[in-house]
Amino acid sequence: MKNDKLVNILAPLCLHLESASPTVHIVKATPDMYDKVGLLEEEQQIHKAVKKRQREFRAGRQSAREAIKRLVSNDSELAQVPILSGKAREPLFPSLISGSISHTDSLCLAACALKSEVPSLGIDVENNTSLASHLFSSIYTQSEKALMETSNTLPDALIFSIKESLFKCLYPFVQVYFDFLDAQITLQPDAENAGQFHFELIGENRTLLQANLPNLSFHGHYCFTEQYVFSLCFFSS
């Protein structure tokens, strides 16, 4: 899949907003990025990892660096800051950048924005395949399960993807793991295969999580094709 085709597919997600504010850049890893050796500190983090993990890690960092270059073309040094992994295996971007990385077996995406405009963001891509029925109760709330049961078009992986991107977006603020069932998702379709989403924190962790969230505008977007499910969310200043 070429980058220009990818951008067209992801247009409903607003992932390439060069003329808008806030600007979010997304980059799809090219085949060479999977085997391109990264910065020394990055390589030290993965030298004991299996080959598959090393390739995914490198592709994510290389695509993230390309997104940073497009975002701040006048600061080439910023793109040479190592993107290491935090305690939750989250990528640690340069202090001026908010970013997120996601991958399947065949696709790797990185999204970046200026932290002054977008304090936090999360991106996720999943294969558009069926979920095992025994997983539904650990991912879907009753409301979400009812929505999926009455829809003939929504992919099984959509709510899963949305909650993955939501975790990435919220984690920098809450700094704790939270469960799939701690958030309830509502969809606002803009088209048959794309739209916006909103979330509500529920469950026994609600008060703790809510207390650490910023008082900022939240934006959630999703779309899907026959092959992939995409989601993106971010807070904007």
Language-model-derived ranges and their functions:
Residues 1-237:
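Core catalytic alpha/beta fold that binds nucleotide/phospho-ligands
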